[in-house]
Amino acid sequence: LSRGLGDVYKRQQVPSVSFEGEEKIATPNPEVYVYDTSGPFSDTEMNIDLKKGLPRMREEWIVSRGDVERLPEITSEYGRMRRDDKSLDHLRFEHIALPYRAKKGEAITQMAYAKKGIITPEMEYVAIRENMNCEELGIETHITPEFVRQEIAAGRAILPANINHPEAEPMII
């Protein structure tokens, strides 16, 4: 028997890393936190505006690495055609940003970072989320940010993180 008691936010070593969890109680056992994959839609403090889009939670992480640049304009023929079609104006979102791309000579995948020995905020986010409850329950875990990096570098895990979708929550496969 369990019931949701509301959202709980965990914040760890990287100041901009926090994620939502939901507290569950299965009496008479201790509280258990499960991570909430519904994104901001279950956050009662969040004002959802579909025209503005979701918060770009990873954008600061992406830009701070210094290996991407924003395109000066929409570069695809199809994208320019859609942009110039006035009959679509009533459908446009307010939040469309120009896309990013890797700077010349840069590899910007999580695997490339992992192989260079770099632990990204995305990797730390995954480790934190995968370890919910472990510390409180006295469970020693091996899912550290370094473990996540090693698994990605070895090709045993992937962390899809498109730079042009900074609203996407990091996850690991």
List each model region and its residues.
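Single conserved hydrophobic/aromatic residue that forms the stacking wall/gate
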Residues: 1-5, 9
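Metallocofactor- and cofactor-centric catalytic cores in central/energy metabolism, strongly enriched
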Residues: 13-24, 28-173
